[in-house]
């Protein structure tokens, strides 16, 4: 029964760091994490702190 307490604590900590609570670096750059190619009007700047299958998309600013 002791293993259930440890397992539930581990799962709680694992879900605490899921997306929505993560990606501060991408959001600080006015970006968002996207799993497919970035939408039009945005450009990819790499993975940053997104999940392994996502890239950080930021708006393209016209000059």
UniProtKB/Swiss-Prot annotation:
Superkingdom field: Eukaryota
Cell membrane among keywords: no
Annotated tissue distribution: Highly expressed in pancreas, heart, liver, brain and kidney. Expressed to a low extent in the venom gland.
Disulphide linkage map: 26-56, 33-50, 38-57
Localization (cell): Secreted
Any Gene Ontology CC annotation: extracellular region
Keywords (A to Z) from UniProt: Disulfide bond, Secreted, Signal
Predominant subcellular localization, coarse grouping: secreted
Signal peptide: 1-22
Name of this chain's protein: Crotasin
Organism of origin: Crotalus durissus terrificus (South American rattlesnake)
Designated gene of the protein: Cts-p2
């Amino acid at each position: 029964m002791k293993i259930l307490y440890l397992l539930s604590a581990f799962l709680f900590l694992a879900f605490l760091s899921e997306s929505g609570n993560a990606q501060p670096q991408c959001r600080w750059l006015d970006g968002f994490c996207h799993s497919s190619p970035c939408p039009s009007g945005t450009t990819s700047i790499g993975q940053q702190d997104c999940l392994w299958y996502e890239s950080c998309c930021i708006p393209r600013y016209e000059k």
